[in-house]
Amino acid sequence: MDTAELVALLHLASPALPIGAFSYSQGLEAALDAPLIRDADGARDWIASGLADVLAQGELPFLAHQLARWHAHDAAALADANDEFVASRESFELRRETEQMGWSLAQLCASLEWGDAARRATLASIPSVALPSAFAFAAAAHGATPDAALAAYAFGWVENQTAAAIKAVPLGQLAGQKIIVALREPIRDAVRRALATPPEAINTFAPQLGILSARHESQYSRLFRS
């Protein structure tokens, strides 16, 4: 990986990226209300489970295959796969989350003129673009390798989940950093598994997450949009 690729991926994984990630907890807030999470250890275990059972089996392999489709510029396959991913979201909140963040990232890519004009036009033509599809476009535009792109996406997800836990549990900053350190190796494992997953083996089945997300829609007190 050269320095330019590294800096581009650090940018994409940054919490300062203006796509609204800070406003979502992806079920973590509902898990606190259940209560399935009570402390730092519970938060770490919850995030680790989401990484291994949700991201590694679904979102990350989908991202890897979308990255390959962007390199090949297979517009039809990109749109079809994006539609399937959006349809796999198990609640209104989770669907709205990926669509809002995907739209925001797509707008950013267009404004910054990342990638070539033809691929930007393809990105703009995808209705309800999901976050992994837009992230794959941005990663491809910067020449990122699949393993590096997936690692950046997974780290950004872990960091955002940890930030949500710090606010909602609540946890101290040091406790949050310990969670991130503990999940470094699991991130590597998740990326390795995702890269070995063929399209037909992608699994987005996450019933507990879907139920918690649906409950969150009517939860009495909320800090987050999911």
From Swiss-Prot:
Chaperone in keyword set: yes
Keywords from the UniProt entry: Chaperone, Cytoplasm, Nickel insertion
Principal cellular location given in the protein's record: cytoplasm
Subcellular location: Cytoplasm
Domain of life the protein comes from: Bacteria
Gene Ontology CC annotations of this record: cytoplasm
InterPro entries according to UniProt: UreF (IPR002639), UreF_sf (IPR038277)
GO molecular function: nickel cation binding
Gene3D superfamilies: Urease accessory protein UreF
Family in the record: Belongs to the UreF family.
Function: Required for maturation of urease via the functional incorporation of the urease nickel metallocenter.
Quaternary structure (record): UreD, UreF and UreG form a complex that acts as a GTP-hydrolysis-dependent molecular chaperone, activating the urease apoprotein by helping to assemble the nickel containing metallocenter of UreC. The UreE protein probably delivers the nickel.
Official protein name in the record: Urease accessory protein UreF
Source organism of this protein record: Burkholderia mallei (strain ATCC 23344)
Lineage per the UniProt record: Bacteria, Pseudomonadati, Pseudomonadota, Betaproteobacteria, Burkholderiales
This protein's encoding gene: ureF
